[in-house]
C-alpha cells in the first residue's frame, strides 16, 4: 500500500499522537462542530472516489486524514495521508516607482527569518471572490502598513497548490498597485514576528532569487507569475 507524506514517516497511531500532542487536544471537537464533512468532499470530482476517511487531528487551521481513494488511473483504492488547510492569499505590493514590498518574517517551523510577500489564510473556507479580495487587502495593510492608492487596482493572478503531494492548500495570487502608506501603519497579529519591511527593485529581486536569498515558495511562485505576465522583469542584468 502507498501512503502520502506523513504516513511514510509514521504509522497511523504514532502520527496521531505526535501531531495532536503539538496542538490543542480539544481542537478536533471544535473543528468538527464548525466544519463537519467539509474537507472530505470539496476537492473530489469526476472519476475520483473516496472509499473511506480516517481523521487523525483537526484544529481551526488544518485537518489531517488518511483517505482510501479510487482515481481514474488507479481503480484499486490507495491510502494517502492528507493535510487539509484553509486557502490563503499572497499579495505582491507594488509602489508607483515599480518597487515590490517584501517583509522579513520569522518562521518557527524552519527556524529562520526569510524574505517573502505578505500573505495569510482566508478565514472562511467557502469564501466568494469579494471575500478573498478583502482578505488580500487586509493582509497587505496588517503586515506592511500599505494600502491601495485611491486610483489603485487589485489584480487577480490566479491560484496554485502549495504542495499537492500531501496538502490541498490553495493560494490565490494578487498584485496590488500602486500602493501608499497607511496613516495608522501596520496592524500585525500578536503571533507574527516581522523584522523588516521594505521595497526592492526588480533587479534586486532577481538577484535575491538567483542568490537563494528568497526561499519562500509562495514568493517564488508569485514572482514567476508576475514575470510570465510581463508585470515584473526578472531578466538578469
Give the residues covered by each predicted segment.
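Conserved Nudix-box catalytic region and its N-terminal flanking loop in Nudix hydrolases
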Residues: 44-47, 83-86, 90-138, 184, ...
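Nudix hydrolase/Nudix homology domain
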Residues: 42-48, 113, 120, 156, ...
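Short, Lys/Arg-enriched N-terminal segments with co-localized hydrophobic residues
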Residues: 34-42
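Acidic, metal-coordinating catalytic segment for phosphate/diphosphate chemistry
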Residues: 52-97, 105
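Short hydrophobic transmembrane-like helices used for membrane targeting/insertion
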Residues: 1, 19-23
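Active-site segment of metal-dependent pyrophosphate-handling enzymes
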Residues: 54, 63, 86-87, 94-96, ...
Amino acid at each position: 500500500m502507498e501512503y502520502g507524506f506523513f504516513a511514510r514517516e509514521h504509522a497511523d497511531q504514532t502520527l496521531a499522537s505526535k501531531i495532536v500532542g503539538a496542538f490543542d487536544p480539544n481542537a478536533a471537537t471544535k473543528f468538527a462542530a464548525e466544519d463537519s464533512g467539509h474537507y472530505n468532499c470539496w476537492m473530489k470530482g469526476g472519476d475520483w472516489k473516496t472509499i473511506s476517511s480516517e481523521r487523525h487531528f483537526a484544529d481551526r487551521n488544518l485537518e489531517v486524514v488518511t483517505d482510501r481513494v479510487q482515481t481514474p488511473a488507479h481503480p484499486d483504492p490507495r491510502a494517502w495521508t492528507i493535510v487539509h488547510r484553509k486557502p490563503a492569499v499572497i499579495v505582491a505590493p507594488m509602489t508607483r516607482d515599480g518597487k515590490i514590498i517584501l517583509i522579513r518574517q520569522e518562521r518557527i517551523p524552519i527556524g529562520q527569518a526569510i524574505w517573502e510577500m505578505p500573505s495569510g489564510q482566508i478565514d472562511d473556507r467557502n469564501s466568494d471572490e469579494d471575500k478573498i479580495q478583502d482578505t488580500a487587502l487586509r493582509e497587505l495593510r496588517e503586515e506592511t502598513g500599505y494600502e491601495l492608492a485611491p486610483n489603485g487596482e487589485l489584480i487577480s493572478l490566479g491560484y496554485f497548490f502549495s504542495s499537492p503531494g500531501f496538502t490541498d492548500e490553495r493560494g490565490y495570487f494578487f498584485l496590488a498597485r500602486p500602493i501608499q502608506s497607511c496613516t495608522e501603519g501596520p496592524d500585525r497579529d500578536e503571533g507574527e514576528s516581522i523584522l523588516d519591511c521594505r521595497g526592492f527593485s526588480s533587479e534586486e529581486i532577481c538577484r535575491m532569487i538567483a542568490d537563494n536569498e528568497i526561499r519562500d515558495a509562495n514568493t517564488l511562485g508569485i514572482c514567476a507569475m508576475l514575470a510570465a505576465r510581463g508585470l515584473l522583469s526578472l531578466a538578469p542584468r
